[in-house]
A protein has these predicted regions:
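Glycine-rich anion/phosphate-binding loops
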Residues: 1
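Acyl-thioester C-C bond-transforming condensing/cleaving domain
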Residues: 8-18, 30-142
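Acidic helix-start/capping segments at beta-turn-to-alpha-helix junctions
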Residues: 20-28
Length: 142
């Protein structure tokens, strides 16, 4: 939905996307749940055929750009940046450089992150979440 809105706000309609080499560059740093699910199936069943042919696409960082480029028929550059929590910001910076150097006229860019129990548990294990959620006025502290 956000990608569609970005194209609409930039006045890039389907004809523009079809006639120009518009690229896509997204930041995405991990995909935990499909990998954990695959490991569970292999541990229990010892049969990779049970994973199915679509599981690989769920576990790749580039799934976001692959799907969006297909949906919008994008023909320009297509890749994913992985830089932990800064992945989305890096994709915007890389897009700026590509356009500034004349390598692309337009690029859909941004960030996407899988949110699920497993990915949140890893951040919780790092003590990255506040234990004082009842004090929202003190949310930003050194």
């Amino acid at each position: 939905m956000a990608s569609q809105q970005a194209f609409e706000q930039s006045l890039m309609d389907e004809a523009y996307l079809r006639e120009n080499e518009v690229g896509i560059l997204f930041g995405n740093d991990s995909s935990a749940k499909p990998v954990i699910e695959a490991a569970r199936i292999m541990d229990e069943k010892h049969d990779s055929a049970l994973l199915g042919s679509g599981l690989i696409f769920q576990s790749m960082n580039s799934t976001v750009t692959m799907n969006l480029s297909t949906i919008f028929h994008l023909r320009g550059i297509n890749f994913t940046v992985s830089a932990a929590c800064a992945s989305g910001s890096h994709s915007i910076g890389m897009t700026y450089l590509l356009i500034r150097q004349g390598l692309q006229d337009a690029v859909l860019c941004g960030g996407a992150q899988e949110v699920n129990y497993y990915s949140m548990a890893t951040f919780d294990a790092l003590a990255a979440f506040s234990v004082r959620m009842d004090e929202p006025t003190k949310a930003s502290r050194p």
